[in-house]
Amino acid sequence: MTTGFLQKIFGSRNQRLVKQYQKTVTTINALETQIEKLTDDQLRGKTDEFRQRVAAGESLDKLLPEAFAVCREASRRVLKMRHFDVQMIGGMVLHYGKIAEMRTGEGKTLVATLPVYLNALAGRGVHVVTVNDYLAQRDAEWMARLYNFLGLSVGINLSGMEHDQKQQAYAADITYGTNNEFGFDYLRDNMVYETDARVQRALNFAVVDEVDSILIDEARTPLIISGQAEDHTELYVRMNALPPLLERQIGEEKADGTGVEKPGDYTLDEKARQVFLTESGHEKAERLLAEWGLIGEGESLYAPQNITLMHHVYAALRAHTLFHKDQHYVVQNGEVVIVDEFTGRLMAGRRWSDGLHQAVEAKEHVKIQSENQTLASITFQNYFRMYAKLAGMTGTADTEAYEFNEIYGLETVVIPTNRPPKRIDKQDQIYKTAKERYDAVIRDIRDCYERGQPVLVGTTSIENSELLSHLLKQAGLPHEVLNAKQHEREAAIVAEAGRPKRVTIATNMAGRGTDIVLGGNAEKQAAFIEADEAIPADEKARRIQQLHDEWETLHEQVKAAGGLHIIGTERHESRRIDNQLRGRAGRQGDPGSSRFYLSLDDPLLRIFAGDRVRSIMDRLKMPEGEAIEAGIVTRSIESAQRKVEARNFDIRKQLLEYDDVSNDQRKVIYQQRNELLEAHDITETITAMRHGVVTEVVRQFVPEGSIEEQWDVPELEEALRNDWQLDLAIQEMVNESSSITAEEILDAVMTAADEQYEAKVAMVGRESFSAFERSVMLQTVDRLWREHLAALDHLRQGIHLRGYAQKNPKQEYKREAFELFAAMLEAIKQEVTRVVMNVQIQSPEQLEQAAEQIEERGGHLENVEYQHADYAEAGAPVANVAVAAAATATADMVGSAMTHSGPGGEMPKVGRNDPCPCGSGKKYKQCHGKLS
């Protein structure tokens, strides 16, 4: 109550910010007359003037009014578009590192030009991030005219580009690209063997378009670069025969033994998207696997020799019970292609991890591709948090404002619309069955069609969109289908969706990023005519003019019919996705309407609110085809959505907490790797490693401060001979001197190791040997890092079970991840020392050839795949999902106290007495700083 009272007096935080920015807009508007008088050359010259002022120490904040005024005037001249005042406010929100929520059609692409121009003046690069290559290329080509006019260079970073093209794109003042490609480039830059092979500069400022899609929807999905691992193709095929032989149990057994409606072999938890074998299911699976010869007669699935089979059993079960064709994936050209559950788009090249994809391939009887080993990985959460400044824009962020602030430290500011919205959002209609719901949808579409009103129908899956398309064909209603299967025709379909009598079916937000203009998008159609080389120039001009004349008539006709009507055939589990669908109507003050049609069979209602609503319908004795339309029901659905959103937020937050463990490690390992690349001579590092390993080996057989009776000299001599080809007569030294100490033996071994090392260096020269050492070190770090990632992945699979032992899974994961990491560091030191000490050298040329072979083996991996693997979709338990990113992200640690500005941004200097970033609690110098 107090908060509401204070808001009435002082206004909300959002209102105060907008008011504050409005004052700056007044300052910018006052400069407009003066800027308008400048010639094109003088306007372009302002960029050089601004750059000099920034170089002289003037802040970008102080420069903002002039820079925004110049950018607005340049846009008016080049693009024939002048930024509205509310767009200037949006530009300021982005410059100050916040999220701007702007309604559909308010010109987000144009808004971005203001902060992008201002921040590009500093010369440190600006990244504009979009959700797909089409939007990146469209926006870059569209806005490049403005930036080039102002003297700034623009690069486009697309998947499949050549290395040189990528370097040029990143060297430009402004770089457009997709979130996936920016993330993969960061990972690839940390796998190179030469400094000039990197493409990215330090991560300075990013403007993320559709920020909710990238930072919220895809936050659970790490970017993974992987290579082929061991082949289990035959096992997936044989295991595929198991799920059809098992029956689902209906109901959950309670403590008193009741609750099971129908006994079975496995239970499904749709809410958590998990599948579990029951006791009888285990017995049946074991019996069948024994019959097929996969396990011994009478053996348990949990026997040590069979434990890996459990992975295949559950992968096959999840593939058959939780993942459905044309909903979660499609089969295209003999391959299983994932459908993004948030956008409905096909995710070509992306694969589920943990063997799930292979299990689905076996289920669909297509060629099974080999399992992969993770080479490098990062989550979007941790990638985008590395930027010095981050901003974003979207049409729907306010429902997730808390998460943006909590996870990324980004405040959300709702930007006022340029014209007041006129869209009418009607109450949901809820039917008993899906058939009744679709009958009502068809009636509504027919009514709109007869009145000449365009309709956009949103569905939650490809399967539903094709079902509705079939029903519309039966009803004789012409329509277009816009889903992942028609991706290529997407732009053309969206361009026409606002014409009279046009019916368009879209999965979720397919076509997002393109406005639906009432009367049809004449500009888009004009562009198609312009691009057709077969049409003569005068004919093009005539047709384009005719298009614009027709559009005026159609535009007024559609407005009179009520504008675009949105029909939702199901509620998504996120209110934000529903709001995005609604937001397609009523752009820039146009009329429009929306309504959702639901049935009690919908997953959201069935899981969260079905029983309550069904009892209301039964009590009211509602006849078939009659709908409930009441605020109380709509509110209960929104309450269910809030529960799901809260649960998903908890999953993402938990995932981040696990991922932070490995993220610190990744930063340090990548920092160390970059230092190795840039160092001309790593002798000191190699010497420190050798001394550490030699000391450890000697101490195993001759402990510090021990007496002769405790020594095992013969074993020490054998270890030195086998490991490093050091033939030392230590027993003779002991026999000759009765007073020899453990320290003297260590010194003798150390001296011999140093002499052998120096002899190798002398044969080929310091520079050649140092280059060889660097290659060995990089290849060893990369190989053991990959093995470490696999170990962490294995660790995350079962860490949630520690909760049953009254232990905190996060703390246990942190502790064991550190132990694994420490073991990896020891292995790196031992492996590098072993290779360097054992290498047989005849000539510098031979050494150079060996270094090249090492780099080739490490740097040119065959069958490398770039995955955006959703662990949550793989049906892992919630706690397990959360660990997923941590496991994939721990690409992290060889430690070094040196500082380096690497390709992925400024790496913080770790002081010798600072806590070690690995989380052990020790000082850096006593932990991973030892390596350097």
Swiss-Prot record:
It catalyses: ATP + H2O + cellular proteinSide 1 = ADP + phosphate + cellular proteinSide 2. It is an enzyme of class 7 (translocase). Its cofactor is Zn(2+). Keywords: ATP-binding, Cell inner membrane, Cell membrane, Cytoplasm, Membrane, Metal-binding, Nucleotide-binding, Protein transport, Translocase, Translocation, Transport, Zinc. Its EC number is 7.4.2.8. InterPro entries: Helicase_ATP-bd, Helicase_C-like, P-loop_NTPase, SEC_C_motif, SecA, SecA_CS, SecA_DEAD, SecA_motor_DEAD. ATP binds at Q87, G105, E106, G107, K108, T109, D515. The keyword Cytoplasm applies. It is found in: Cell inner membrane; Cytoplasm. It is a peripheral membrane protein. Part of the Sec protein translocase complex. Interacts with the SecYEG preprotein conducting channel. Has a central role in coupling the hydrolysis of ATP to the transfer of proteins into and across the cell membrane, serving both as a receptor for the preprotein-SecB complex and as an ATP-driven molecular motor driving the stepwise translocation of polypeptide chains across the membrane. This is Protein translocase subunit SecA. The lineage of its organism: Bacteria, Pseudomonadati, Pseudomonadota, Betaproteobacteria, Burkholderiales. The gene is secA.
